[in-house]
Amino acid sequence: HCILMAVAKTIYLRPQLNSFISGRRFYQRDEITLGFVAKKRFEDHSEESLVVISAPEDWTLTEVTHRVVGKVHKARTEKNDGVNGAMDVLKKLPRPVLAFVIWIIKTLDFFGKVPDFLRQDDPNFATVFLTNLGSIKCPSVYHHLNNYGSSSIMAAIGTIRKSEKIAGDGSREVRDVVDIGFTLDERIADGFYFARSL
């Protein structure tokens, strides 16, 4: 939850990170959203739900925790609706029909016309699409950006581990560290802006 808050605060301080390219046009978002996938159960073939959380500028760590826990609980316990319900319907379609429906959705995406019920809970349309690989005991990776939606930042959070570090006074100490892999759409800002943001 600390990482989610840190990512959101960084984007508030570096607003160009909250932009995206769609249909060969540049857009600036009005709000910061963080999206991820929540498994219903930690099992190989468990269903997944898509979750998007709005990040107000003044939120606290307690609010982050309540919002994340609440959204994940809802995603795991309630019947799928919105984009999750649409995905349940789409996966039952014959392949030719599915291919046609996907073509329509991708065309709507190009023109920025994807319906709200498909967009609002889809992490592909969030400011940042996060994956917490540490929750399944995996290290961080550099995840590709998707060719659908408007998410310009992918963040993969790894496992928390112990690492020996040298403190400011020269002494050695063992601290908890976590690696995070960020993949960024280089069209929204230059390397200098990204480097200063990270």
Predicted regions and their residues:
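C-terminal catalytic/motor cores of large multi-domain enzyme assemblies
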Residues: 1-198
